[in-house]
Amino acid sequence: MDKNTILGLLLMGVVIFGFSMLNSGDDQSNQPTTEKTEKADAKQATTDIADSLNANELARIKTIVRQYGKQDGDKMVLTNDNVSFTVASDSLTGSVMMDGNMTVALSDLQHAPSADNRLLYNAAMKKVRDAAENVAKYSDFVQFVGGGNKTVKLENELLTLDLSSKGGQIAKATLKKYTAFQHGKDGNCVLFDSKHNSYGFAINTDTHRFDTKEFNFTPVQENDSTVLMKLDFGKGVYFGIRYTLPKNSYLVRMEVVQQNMAAVISSNVSTMDFEWNQKMMRHEKGQTFEERNSGVFYKFSGDDVENLSETSNDEDKTNNHLKWVAFKYQFFSCVLIADQHFIGAAPMKSAVIDKNSEEHNDFLKDVSFNSSLEYNVNNPKPAAFNFFLGPNEYKLLSSFDDKISPDEDLELTRLIPLGWSMFRWINTCIIIPIFNFLGTMNLNYGIIILLLTIFIKLVLFPLTYKSFSSQAKMRVLAPDIKEINDKYPGNENAMKRQQKMMELYNRAGANPMSGCLPMILQLPVYVAMFSFLPSCIELRGESFLWASDLSAPDMILEWDANIPVINWIFGHHLSLFCLLMTGVNIIYTYLNMQANPSNNQMPGMKWMMYLMPVMFLVFFNDYGAGLSYYYFISLLITIAQTYAFRFIIKEDKVRAKMAENAKKPRKKSGFMARLEAAQKRQEAMLREQQKRKK
């Protein structure tokens, strides 16, 4: 054989040997797998074989039925979550209702099932044992665990409530006269729903905790406006929560009621816990201000209103008595007002929804409140509340003081951000009454803001006129002021220059401060309006010209793209009223600079004055259209007043009058005399210092 043949035979041998080893490896690797599978199948088969109820379990169930079951003739019956037990004489019977309306008798669970029924019996066995555990956990309340949820409605002209039998609570609250921008579209304003709101009362004994959120109540329609969610123990023993919704009201009466509960609850129980959790839903198109103006508010009994941070995660714990607690939105609130008070509180919490999460577009915050209430098992009404579910309207909230608490100011109007003390006083005593009066005329709210602006301008007219008169005098004196500045230049002549200025003002009867003071006195009104309009629910959803909602930005230009710097400054839109306000503000600044030439002589003042309107554009771009519209109208009226004053106040007449005043001997005013004396003392000190240096 040649070398090629030998090489071919060797290669064939290698291939055959390789395949043999490969097949041998597969057989060996498969063997453990097969053994594991067989063992797993055996284990599964063992697990799938249901054991039976033993004598101890049956005896325990029999004792439970006798202790917690309901009397039915000569039998005791106990039902829990589709499991029914019956004790008659000394025998125990029962059944388990399975899916598909299949029933398994309790007697069938007392011996091992056949292989065909083991899955069904396993499920039935689990239900029986869970029922026994529920009884151990809930004792007399076990009959109210499980079962299907039922919903009943309470409704009036303003509010629709869905009451859930699960927990006996308000599952959903819908405001009928308001719409909300939720899940990308407009619809009825739902304050909360069952998935994102829950509350309940809990009674703690030495051995058990009974939480109403875990029980299924029976709805009892007492009349058109009242529903009692009831846990009926039989024999005249019951516990319930009664809800009453009066006509044309946002105020829900919620009362905890009971009868003969001493048969179930020990008399040494003196407190009842209350827990309320809510994931606050978005309602507005303008996300920025909705986030800034939502959170947890609360009032101490006989004391002030406080709140958790509205812009960051926060929590607080107090041992003081609380009168009410509110989960407050920008324009709506859920307020629970206790007839008596809450006894302190576990940490109240507010957590801002992460901006990077999917929930951020639909929700604002996760909030919670935990507290306690006084409880007496023999009191037929151990706790009662007024539950406000409605708009943050000043007139409405202020009316509850007389309706609910005539002896104590509830201060619910503090839910509306109207500014600090002085600005709040201007809003509550002047702005809001006039605004409400104009609102009775059924005018468009854009017109109402215009009329309110005109009224404010009329009230401030004397101050504005005084300011412009002073500016006219300063314009007339501008050449003389320039002459003094040129004659006494430099810091070394500062005192002399200032003295000559004061002499000039005194001769002419002018005061450089008289123009500033009227403007300063007008400032609180502008700040008050800055607080009032963004919180005014009357503007919500009201259209005017191109603005579809005066409480939200009137976005004339929007974009989704991420534009560096631009997005950081403006967000993703530009508001037209804000742009108009900025343009008018620049015009007003120009006119004001022309009217006060002295400002142009100050380094950097000119550019500073023109920069301010641009800063306002950035600042107000996210605000509601109503506020920008107000400032736009106010500036237009101010410009009109400026031209009117220039027509009325002739500078020639002002100059002639000042010349006439200069001829008269004038007594120095107290301010001018003190200022001149101070200047002379400073000059003397300066001369003394110069002598010492020499």
Where are these regions (language model features)?
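Helix-loop-helix
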Residues: 1-43, 48, 163, 256-257, ...
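Soluble non-transmembrane domains of integral membrane proteins
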Residues: 51-411
